[in-house]
UniProtKB/Swiss-Prot annotation:
InterPro entries: RGS (IPR016137), RGS_sf (IPR036305), RGS_subdomain_2 (IPR044926)
Protein localization: Membrane; Synapse, Synaptosome; Nucleus; Cytoplasm
GO MF term list: GTPase activator activity
A GO CC term attached to the entry: nucleus
Assembly notes: Interacts with GNAI1 and GNAQ. Interacts with GNAZ and GNAI2. Forms a complex with mu-opioid receptors and G(alpha)z/i2 subunits, including GNAZ and GNAI2; the formation of this complex results in mu-opioid receptor desensitization.
Biological process, per Gene Ontology: negative regulation of signal transduction
Record function comment: Regulates G protein-coupled receptor signaling cascades, including signaling via muscarinic acetylcholine receptor CHRM2 and dopamine receptor DRD2. Inhibits signal transduction by increasing the GTPase activity of G protein alpha subunits, thereby driving them into their inactive GDP-bound form. Binds selectively to GNAZ and GNAI2 subunits, accelerates their GTPase activity and regulates their signaling activities. Negatively regulates mu-opioid receptor-mediated activation of the G-proteins.
Keywords attached to this entry: Cytoplasm, Glycoprotein, GTPase activation, Membrane, Nucleus, Signal transduction inhibitor, Synapse, Synaptosome, Ubl conjugation
Origin superkingdom: Eukaryota
Name of the protein: Regulator of G-protein signaling 17
Post-translational modification as stated in the protein's UniProt record: N- and O-glycosylated in synapsomal membranes.
Region: Disordered, residue numbers: 1-21
């Protein structure tokens, strides 16, 4: 009986000594646009996807490709994106903003695939090339992937042949096809989106005030 009471008292003591409602002190910045690389943007976008009722799928390559670090773009740079898709895609800030828009259209995988191909082109180690080529296939080419990109049969045949001997440029045809799709299909809607218009209004407004 004494042992039972003793164990109960110890349990009560342990509970009383446990920390209360302590929360980690996670500070977060308030970004002026999506070009910031802080974690608050990632969480906000994930919540937006959950609220939309669409299940989110994290691919193996996407875990590497978080929001790219970059400096805030100048007003001239932001305005120039409307005239030149290539120029926007060459800047991390432009890609980050475009990626946020694609996420609202559930086509973020197109940009992620393009970025993964760019990353593969930089590799020289054969083992790393083989591993990254395999991950790209599993994440974006395989029909079993929830983030499969839209490619025609000819390009798929080329990819299947290239898998026998992976190289840094094995996805070049597929990358060009997806790049063209984003340019012709997604980019015009991006320029008319609230995401881009709000950013333009914010920088033009601040410029006129100064």
């Amino acid at each position: 009986m004494r042992k039972r009471q003793q164990s109960q008292n110890e349990g009560t003591s342990a509970v009383s000594q446990a920390p209360g409602n302590q929360r980690p002190n996670n500070t977060c910045c308030f970004c002026w646009c999506c070009c910031c690389s802080c974690s608050c943007l990632t969480v906000r976008n994930e919540d937006r996807g959950d609220n939309a009722g669409r299940p989110t799928h994290t691919t193996k390559m996407e875990s590497i490709q978080v929001i790219e670090e970059c400096q805030n773009p100048t007003a001239d740079e932001i305005l120039s994106w409307a005239q030149n898709f290539d120029k926007m895609m060459k800047t991390p800030a432009g890609r980050n903003l475009f990626r946020e828009f694609l996420r609202t259209e559930y086509s973020e995988e197109n940009l992620l695939f393009w970025l993964a191909c760019e990353d593969l082109k930089k590799e020289q180690n054969k083992k790393v090339i083989e591993e990254k080529a395999r991950l790209i296939y599993e994440d974006y080419i395989s029909i079993l992937s929830p983030k499969e990109v839209s490619l025609d049969s000819r390009v798929r045949e080329v990819i299947n042949r290239n898998l026998l001997d992976p190289s840094p440029h094995m996805y070049e045809d597929a990358q060009l096809q997806i790049y063209t799709l984003m340019h012709r299909d997604s980019f015009p809607r991006f320029l008319n989106s609230q995401i881009y218009k709000s950013l333009v209004e914010s920088i033009t407004g601040s410029t006129s005030e100064t």
